[in-house]
């Protein structure tokens, strides 16, 4: 989860390395944080006019609003992590085994 980008909907992406948390905007404290961020110019609205379903908290103090549910965003992050693990370079030992067996490891 250190590099790459997360699709937050409507062809909008955010750097995974900058994400602190993904929360539902339904609670009063989160709504207050969103209001303050808007007043301070630290709010990015990526909902394209749709209902806000997730608030993404970033390292720089920005809050990014998304129309995608937090659970969906987290599952996209997990899928990306799994894909990175599958595409990691194989070790020398695994390469030798692959050559011997003629199969993918």
Curated annotation (Swiss-Prot):
Belongs to the RemA family. PANTHER family: REGULATORY PROTEIN SSL2874-RELATED (PTHR38449:SF1), REGULATORY PROTEIN TM_1690-RELATED (PTHR38449). Residues 78-105 have a biased composition (Acidic residues). This is Putative regulatory protein COPRO5265_1186. InterPro entries: RemA-like (IPR007169). It comes from Coprothermobacter proteolyticus (strain ATCC 35245 / DSM 5265 / OCM 4 / BT). The lineage of its organism: Bacteria, Pseudomonadati, Coprothermobacterota, Coprothermobacteria, Coprothermobacterales. Pfam families: RemA-like. HAMAP family: RemA (MF_01503). Residues 76-105 are annotated as: Disordered.
């Amino acid at each position: 989860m250190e590099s790459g980008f997360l699709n937050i909907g409507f062809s909008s992406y955010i750097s995974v390395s900058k994400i602190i948390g993904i929360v539902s905007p339904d609670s009063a404290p989160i709504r207050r944080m969103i209001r303050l961020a808007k007043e301070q110019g630290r709010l990015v609205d990526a909902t394209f006019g749709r209902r806000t379903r997730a608030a993404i908290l970033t390292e720089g103090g920005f809050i990014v609003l998304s129309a995608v549910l937090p659970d969906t965003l987290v599952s996209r992050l997990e899928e990306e992590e799994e894909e990175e693990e599958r595409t990691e370079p194989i070790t020398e030992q695994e390469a030798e085994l692959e050559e011997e067996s003629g199969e993918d490891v």
